[in-house]
């Protein structure tokens, strides 16, 4: 009898356990189906607002919100004062920070001193193109107004429309959630370079190409056009300089051939190039790019929640999530891998400091030669060396992760940039000697303050103008966007606490 009772009890436990397991499996299957359920066939209303995607993709949305955790402001001009001299006469000499989480991308664009202090939609220093990589409202407006109209006018033109930070609609189709390129210039660039278009690419390739919508080198191409009313307009169209190839020297040759310059240097009067964020181009030269590892494999690794597998949308440093990002392929310890990365970074830092020290001194020595009477003809070759030196060195550092993505290429570019700067300085010795200044020593630029004084950057004035803008026009933009249903006010929480010139978290 006792044996029977034990057998019966055991059977009941097994039956209940199987029932619970079956129930759990069914619940997980429901979760999986719900997670993979696509949006409404007509698309998501309010598609530029990532909050509207949360009902279909709650896990992805919740993980995306965690990009808010990457909130540190690192003032790169304070860390590397030589950059101020390198960018004299250009907005980057005022303000340049290391990137934060995508949660802050749009607000950081609004806050930076580079975008100026417009008083209405027709004023300010920069074109509307400067919103392009910051918001899912950009593809919405391109669809709404047309590409050329979007690229026409000032940055402030769309201040009350471009109000949502980088999110779902930048990379996904709102009807199917499939990866999709949202900016026409990417396919034009890929075709010019001889690559497959986005649509022709494999899914694995698309997991990097959606990043290449923004993490690439580009310039603003002046484009004349007529609107529907026959009015002549000028658009500043984002263009990828890839028709000769995607290497640094091939892009350099492209720019030289069309005599393009982003600006004329404030000290040396050199026609300069500013590298943007060429992460994709440099990644393609590195071992991960060559082996077909995608950006998302490391920066958005797959994660498991019950029966559900999904891509972690907390885009960030893979070293913060090594068990999912690195250890699927690597067999070394986490600490050993971190030590390798640290070594790569230190080598980059060493060569960067040498290269930009020589570049800064070349600018200052050229400025001195001009002051003494040197002619443009005497300085032509010198300025070409400076232009190429800074372009190559800037390409090495403008993508903050390039030291890891392509360490050999980064060191090569910094060495090449340093060599070009030294060529300029050797020729400058002769020019300075001719004008009686053979003993000239360039002033030091060891701090941000010293460098900005040399670059004639009036920080107090720029900050005062910006703070006034933030108290006036920026507030109007947000009020209008909320009133018109373009912006969820919840998305503003904690987004504007810090910049390089204020910190509201400190009493």
Curated annotation (Swiss-Prot):
Its cofactor is Ca(2+); heme c. Heme c 5 binds at residues 288, 326, 329-330. Pfam families: Cytochrom_C552. GO terms for biological process: anaerobic electron transport chain; anaerobic respiration; nitrate assimilation. Its EC number is 1.7.2.2. Binds 1 Ca(2+) ion per monomer. Binds 5 heme c groups covalently per monomer. CDD domains: NrfA-like. Heme c 1 binds at residues 130, 133-134. Its main location: periplasm. One of its GO terms (cellular component) is outer membrane-bounded periplasmic space. Pathway: Nitrogen metabolism; nitrate reduction (assimilation). Heme c 2 binds at residues 168, 171-172, 313. Changing residue 218 to F: Reduces nitrite reductase activity by over 99%, but does not decrease the low sulfite reductase activity. Belongs to the cytochrome c-552 family. Homodimer. Interacts with NrfH. May form a heterotetramer with NrfH. This is Cytochrome c-552. It comes from Wolinella succinogenes (strain ATCC 29543 / DSM 1740 / CCUG 13145 / JCM 31913 / LMG 7466 / NCTC 11488 / FDC 602W) (Vibrio succinogenes).
């Amino acid at each position: 009898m006792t044996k029977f009772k034990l057998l019966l009890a055991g059977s009941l436990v097994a039956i209940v356990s199987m029932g619970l397991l079956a129930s759990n499996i069914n619940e997980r299957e429901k979760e999986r189906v719900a997670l993979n359920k696509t949006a409404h066939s007509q698309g998501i209303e309010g598609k530029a607002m990532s909050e509207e995607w949360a009902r279909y993709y709650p896990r992805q949305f919740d993980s995306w919100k965690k990009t808010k955790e990457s909130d540190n402001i690192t003032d790169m001009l304070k860390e590397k004062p030589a950059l101020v001299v390198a960018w004299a006469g250009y907005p980057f000499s005022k303000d340049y920070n290391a990137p934060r989480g995508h949660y802050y991308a749009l607000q950081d664009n609004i806050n930076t001193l580079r975008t100026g202090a417009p008083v209405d939609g027709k004023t300010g220093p920069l074109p509307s193109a400067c919103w392009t990589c910051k918001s899912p409202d950009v593809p919405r407006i391109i669809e709404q107004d047309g590409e050329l109209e979007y690229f026409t006018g000032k940055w402030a033109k769309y201040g009350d429309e471009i109000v949502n930070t980088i999110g779902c609609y930048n990379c996904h189709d709102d009807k199917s959630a499939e990866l999709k390129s949202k900016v026409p210039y990417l396919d034009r660039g890929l075709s010019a370079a001889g690559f497959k278009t986005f649509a022709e690419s494999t899914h694995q390739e698309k997991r990097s190409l959606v990043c290449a919508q923004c993490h690439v080198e580009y310039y603003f191409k002046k484009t004349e056009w007529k609107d529907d009313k026959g009015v002549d307009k000028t658009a500043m169209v984002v263009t990828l300089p890839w028709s000769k190839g995607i290497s640094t020297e091939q892009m350099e040759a492209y720019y030289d051939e069309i005599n393009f310059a982003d600006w004329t240097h404030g000290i040396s009067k050199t026609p300069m190039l500013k590298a943007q964020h060429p992460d994709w181009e440099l990644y393609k030269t590195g071992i991960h790019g060559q082996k077909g590892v995608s950006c998302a494999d490391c920066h958005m690794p797959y994660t498991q929640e019950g029966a559900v597998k999904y891509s972690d949308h907390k885009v960030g440093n893979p070293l913060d999530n090594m068990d999912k990002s690195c250890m699927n392929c690597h067999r070394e310890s986490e600490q050993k891998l971190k030590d390798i990365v640290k070594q790569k970074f230190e080598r980059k830092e060493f060569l960067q400091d040498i290269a930009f020290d020589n570049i800064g001194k070349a600018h200052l020595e050229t400025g001195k030669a001009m002051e003494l009477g040197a002619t443009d003809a005497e300085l032509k070759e010198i300025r070409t060396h400076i232009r190429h030196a800074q372009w190559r060195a800037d390409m090495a550092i403008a993508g903050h992760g390039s030291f890891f993505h392509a360490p050999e290429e980064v060191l090569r570019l910094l060495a090449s940039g340093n060599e070009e700067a030294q060529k300029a300085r050797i020729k400058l010795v002769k020019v300075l000697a001719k004008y009686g200044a053979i003993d000239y020593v360039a002033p030091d630029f060891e701090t941000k303050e010293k460098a900005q004084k040399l670059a004639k950057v009036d920080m107090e004035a720029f900050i005062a103008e910006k703070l006034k803008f933030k108290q006036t026009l920026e507030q109007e933009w947000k009020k209008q966007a909320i009133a018109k249903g373009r912006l969820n006010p919840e998305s503003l929480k904690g987004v504007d606490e810090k910049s390089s010139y204020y910190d509201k978290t400190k009493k």
